[in-house]
Amino acid sequence: MRRGGWRKRAENDGWETWGGYMAAKVQKLEEQFRSDAAMQKDGTSSTIFSGVAIYVNGYTDPSAEELRKLMMLHGGQYHVYYSRSKTTHIIATNLPNAKIKELKGEKVIRPEWIVESIKAGRLLSYIPYQLYTKQSSVQKGLSFNPICRPEDPLPGPSNIAKQLNNRVNHIVKKIETENEVKVNGMNSWNEEDENNDFSFVDLEQTSPGRKQNGIPHPRGSTAIFNGHTPSSNGALKTQDCLVPMVNSVASRLSPASSQEEDKAEKSSTDFRDCTLQQLQQSTRNTDALRNPHRTNSFSLSPLHSNTKINGAHHSTVQGPSSTKSTSSVSTFSKAAPSVPSKPSDCNFISNFYSHSRLHHISMWKCELTEFVNTLQRQSNGIFPGREKLKKMKTGRSALVVTDTGDMSLLNSPRHQSCIMHVDMDCFFVSVGIRNRPDLKGKPVAVTSNRGTGRAPLRPGANPQLEWQYYQNKILKGKADIPDSSLWENPDSAQADGSDSVLSRAEIASCSYEARQLGIKNGMFFGHAKQLCPNLQAVPYDFHAYKEVARTLYETLASYTHNIEAVSCDEALVDITEILAETKLTPDEFANAVRMEIKDQTKCTASVGIGSNILLARMATRKAKPDGQYHLKPEEVDDFIRGQLVTNLPGVGHSMESKLASLGIKTCGDLQYMTMAKLQKEFGPKTGQMLYRFCRGLDDRPVRTEKERKSVSAEINYGIRFTQPKEAEAFLLSLSEEIQRRLEATGMKGKRLTLKIMVRKPGAPVETAKFGGHGICDNIARTVTLDQATDNAKIIGKAMLNMFHTMKLNISDMRGVGIHVNQLVPTNLNPSTCPSRPSVQSSHFPGGSYSVRDVFQVQKAKKSTEEEHKEVFRAAVDLEISPVSRTCTFLPPFPAHLPTSPDTNKAESSGKWNGLHSPVSVQSRLNLSIEVPSPSQLDQSVLEALLPDLREQVEQVCAVQQAESHGDKKKEPVNGCNTGILPQPVGTVLLQIPEPQESNSDTGINVIALPAFSQVDPEVFAALPAELQRELKAAYDQRQRQDENSTHQQSASASVPKNPLLHLKAAVKEKKRNKKKKTIGSPKRIQSPLKNRLLNSPAKTLPGACGSPQKLIDGFLKHEGPPAEKPLEELSASTSGVPGLSSLQSDPAGCVRPPAPNLAGAVEFNDVKTLLREWITTISDPMEEDILQVVKYCTDLIEEKDLEKLDLVIKYMKRLMQQSVESVWNMAFDFILDNVQVVLQQTYGSTLKVT
């Protein structure tokens, strides 16, 4: 009978389409859920879980049925079957390791999230309720506290100073509660470190004003500091600036000087994420007096005045300061120092970050991400933007009024996923000239230099040499100096003899008119001025940028909260739900959004729409500037082929050059490359990414929350030291900055990294850019602490130790950075731990402890080294019935795990008697306990236990010994243990047969043992004498079984070929043998796959010990194809076989097809043995053998056993790569390509092969 035949006979039931039955079933369940929800709702209903769809995995408290009712009452969805595309949250209290890997990247949440959200009356953040996270088993995520007190210190240098007049005790006591200040934390300013963004606590304004969707509008009054205002106190405290540098370094490491700091840390433990509120009143007053005709609001310090840098004027805020500032602001401005010229100044760090645009960009991204999260937490399900669209779209409402008057979407068609990418056009330029109509239509650039594009040449600087160095490094990929003569004769590298050079100020953004002339973002202003002498320079206006970015996100939030904050000028929005509700087309909705953004911000935005994030971004490229483009699904193939590979995310200069060397320039060229070839060239992850992206495939979801992986702070501008003490003091100051950032995020770090940029030997001492780092070498040192910390003194001490080991020339230092990794939460809340029901046993005295608790305690106490020395482990599995909650002890099986060296812990811990436990057995038992035999218990560990715990374990061992002697005299009935609870009539259950009497003495599963030739003699000799005797007896028994099996096989008729395998015969075998003989190869050995199919004793005897599936497969092969016998005869023939009496036909009249097998091998260990024998004994694989392996892999895909498929593929890859014959690598590529094609067609994805 061919596989799938039983399905084909049922094709005429109305669901001919593949997967149509399940799709219809799921749709019916969803409709049933909606109808039940309409009947269940009463006065206590709400829309807290609107847009949330849960899937319950396993036992939970509340139960799955209770959670279903809660989702009905509160506007959520409950999925009986998990869907990766539809299910938003998975609810579970415990998952096996295989499930954790399978659900990697999904939101696995504890049920307390639902219960506590209902209690709170709003949707809480799921991060504190995650069951597992990517970082570690103890990290639950970031927790932010929106409460702050006036006396708390600042979290970072970009915030306003602790004191207004540089006096410690001068603190404002009364803060008006009409406004709240948005937390403005710190993060690395490095543009490349986007994943290290840090979230900000978003506090709402409570003052009257226009709001959208419950969120205050920023135009009434600005209550959020943008962070560009520098503080009077930087990373160094005021008293540190008044003492000599030597005393400063020593004092900060001494215990006496840290008492006040410890007190301050203790007092601010619960309010780390807060920014200063002392200037709140003054900020509100100055904002109210803003001049509406200017883009900037006011200037708080002389830092915003024009200052000569590199021969050009540098300004942060355009125009003069407001003359109507309050007295408090004026006092603060006078107290603020000027721009520091040395890193030893007190406020150097804070001033650096306040002027760094890259720091502001990363800070705004974190702030906007938290803004979106706050919107989701406080959502009431009402969106003003949608209501406006519904009124515009008259006669095409998506809502259908049912007979009962309820509003529902039952009859609405299911829309395909639709992602919208919104990107502002030339963001910095558009904001800078929105109130300057004279500059519109002209080439404009945002930069710090507003001069002629030239700066005076400083003595010792050699700009031409640096230019040649970087050009050579980028274009040719060489890191060496292009011409050694340039180092010896610096003057020869000068472009000309003039006393001025081109300005090195970078262009942050340029208009499209400037881009048409060859100017690009990131270009030096001097070079851009040469290309376009009429280029107009516009200064930075951080306050205006932030205001427009906030307006952009508020506009999007009026339609939906499913937003991913990409940057201050860029966002991804999932508009699938909006289109379904409003019945608008994607183009109509995009046009409405663009018009509203333009009205609110006076800036234009481009919109791209696609079925996934990749296509939406590509569509935006075509839509720019000031346009929109909808990439329809039917247009994707033609559109994607013509796209350059550089348009794909993740493809930079290096990868572009590597692809060009392969003759690939477009995505169409890339589509001709197989995944195996791409993974070989670029690695498994990058190869798979390129394979999918070039076909327009992208399954990345719109993410609103991201976990923080590191905290860092780097400065590579203005770093010039003359003495070691200055460098040490700066490291301590940067450590204090790291402490503030860690405290602001509520995290501690364990791994510390110090990065130093040192001038390259021979490079000019004076850099081409004033204060820049020039040509440098990067040096890094890393240390891992015993415990995670956020203390500046501990971090600073570690930094100084690593710094001293570098033995650097202090004057050559050009950059310093500190990175903290391996983050853990500062406070672990015990209430967030998964709650589990207590398991107590009435069979033991002092029932407050269970056997599970005993082994969990012992497991926690064992070190890693001891775990590697353990040969056997006790597998304790407790399952509590949610109905009875009773504990029933069963007579245990002899439980010993195999000693195979290639059996890992994950395999061992999930097996029972060396075999996988049937799920049906576990589900019908209230409690099943396995404890090791008395010979396996460590007596020293047993004696260290508490008396009552030790007594419990001893009693269990005594019961085991008594039952093992009793089992020798009494055989189990039909292979089933008498301790199993009775079941209702008609229950289909596969039982594991009791071991034979000859096996009961040894307690070893002989099938699971490795070959005796594979046992390491040294390991065997190190085992206890009793265990050695058991293993020898087990091997003797297996040898006797093999002899008996061989004898019975020779006497019986030949077994017919497996009817499930329809493979080709060997092609031109004689010709290939002849070719081999000319080379002098040995005689061809018959394939082990054929030998295994016909001669394996373990597979031909249906009575052999093994798993139920093995018994079934052996029986089916022994009896012949099931179609040749009537079902009655088949049922009668199985009645005498242990463990097979329950094998019945299904209601459709078909026998269940056998499990996928490779020449009869079903279990993974048997498959591994067969593959190893095949690859190591055959030099040239036959085509039919390769096709047999391909069919086995595709059968695994059909049975949805992808975990075993992954193990088989990886094991074959390791074996075939070790072979010296190149034909094996070709065979593996052929197998993998076929498997990936089937996976792609079945699941829409491929297997990651590392």
Curated annotation (Swiss-Prot):
What's its top-level EC category? Answer: transferase
**Disordered: annotated span:** 204-236, 252-329, 1034-1101, 1117-1146
Among Pfam families, the record links this protein to: BRCT, IMS, IMS_C, IMS_HHH_1, REV1_C, UBM
Main location as per UniProt: nucleus
Q: Which Gene3D superfamilies match?
A: 3.30.70.270, 3.40.1170.60, 5' to 3' exonuclease, C-terminal subdomain, 6.10.250.1490, 6.10.250.1630, BRCT domain, DNA polymerase, Y-family, little finger domain, DNA repair protein Rev1, C-terminal domain
Q: What is known of its domains?
A: The C-terminal domain is necessary for protein interactions.
UmuC domain spans which residues? 419-652
The family assignment reads: Belongs to the DNA polymerase type-Y family.
Basic residues bias located where?
A: 1069-1078
**Annotated gene:** REV1
| Protein interaction domain: annotated segments | 1151-1250
Interaction with target DNA: region residues: 352-362, 652-655, 708-716
Q: Where in the cell is it found?
A: Nucleus
Swiss-Prot/TrEMBL keywords = DNA damage, DNA repair, DNA synthesis, DNA-binding, Magnesium, Metal-binding, Nucleotidyltransferase, Nucleus, Transferase
* Residues binding Mg(2+) 1, per UniProt: 423, 569-570
Q: What role does it play?
A: Deoxycytidyl transferase involved in DNA repair. Transfers a dCMP residue from dCTP to the 3'-end of a DNA primer in a template-dependent reaction. May assist in the first step in the bypass of abasic lesions by the insertion of a nucleotide opposite the lesion. Required for normal induction of mutations by physical and chemical agents.
Listed binding positions for dCTP are 357, 423-427, 509-515, 521, 569
One GO cellular component term? nucleus
The residue numbers the entry assigns to motif Nuclear localization signal are: 1071-1077
**Name of this protein:** DNA repair protein REV1
